[in-house]
């Protein structure tokens, strides 16, 4: 039986057979074009041209679910959702060409975006880094379509990434940090930002920090988990998982102060999700920082969220009269202050959860070179105490 026979009911079976045989003989036969509704298309690995970009993206995301962590999957979904709103989710994937992709990239780079709840958008568009990330995710969708026979070609061929300028850290100065702490409305907020700045932990790690992870007697703090969106996960990087942070005195003092507020509070049993799909572990956690201690309203949770910490930072920055920065600059402040104090970059990388010092050099390289005078002054102070001086007589002979 010939598939799609109704399409060809004006032709005899013999005529159809002759035209198909001739197309095969001359090398121009296209099974998918000749029989677009055939059940054999998938068997023969023929490209389907009828998937919308939304349908293709949904197939891609469905298979990604077991490959990546849920936080990464949510990022994929959010990015693709934003892109589809520009492309038009009902457009056929096969209709998207290079010109359309360049239009999408331009819109991402220069157009207005809808901000998340309580987020501050200071200017239209997105950074080149963000746009390149969006386009990389979209490229993965199209490549998935090619690899699995849904598309004949990837329209991303020949499109190069936008040139990126590396983000320069914008740490707080010591005077600004004092003003920030003074602007905090309660002791818990003061303690939280002291711990953040003097340890360099990520905001999500700060939210998930438990007293079970802290050993003030030995001056250490273990980072075992992270809060990502609505669930606990292991820290962002493998190197950052179960890392031991060696606490300096200001951090210890802040934790001792916080101990009086939350150390004897309720212990929770929480589910921590690992990188491996479907694997979780129950952990005991008495949260170090708790909204209940300083909440003005009753609809608080057992722990802070990354958004609530960011709002706390924004409010304190505004009250202190400081130039607006993102709360992640507290982490950069730790790194920059530590480098100025002469700490080994490898030690800083370990404290911050990086695999090696390469990330420290990449992120803070320019900042480090701008502080050469401070480094020379540091060396003069430290080395002058024990470095031998050249004898004057020997110097005269030479």
From Swiss-Prot:
Active-site residues, Swiss-Prot/TrEMBL: 202, 236, 331, 354, 364 (o-(3'-phospho-dna)-tyrosine intermediate)
Pfam families: Arm-DNA-bind_2 (PF12167), Phage_integrase (PF00589)
Family: Belongs to the 'phage' integrase family.
CDD domains: INT_ICEBs1_C_like
Keywords: DNA integration, DNA recombination, DNA-binding, Viral genome integration, Virus entry into host cell
Domain of life according to the entry: Bacteria
Ranges for domain Core-binding (CB): 51-146
Domain Tyr recombinase: 167-378
InterPro entries: CB (IPR044068), DNA_brk_join_enz (IPR011010), Integrase-like_cat_sf (IPR013762), Integrase_catalytic (IPR002104), Integrase_recombinase_N (IPR010998), Min27-like_integrase_DNA_bind (IPR022000), Tyrosine_recombinase_XerCD (IPR050090)
PANTHER family reported in the protein's UniProt record: PHAGE INTEGRASE-RELATED (PTHR30349), PROPHAGE INTEGRASE INTR-RELATED (PTHR30349:SF36)
Name of the protein in question: Putative defective protein IntQ
GO molecular function: DNA binding; site-specific recombinase activity
Its biological purpose: Integrase is necessary for integration of the phage into the host genome by site-specific recombination. In conjunction with excisionase, integrase is also necessary for excision of the prophage from the host genome.
GO biological process: chromosome segregation; DNA recombination; establishment of integrated proviral latency; symbiont entry into host cell; viral genome integration into host DNA
Keyword DNA-binding on entry: yes
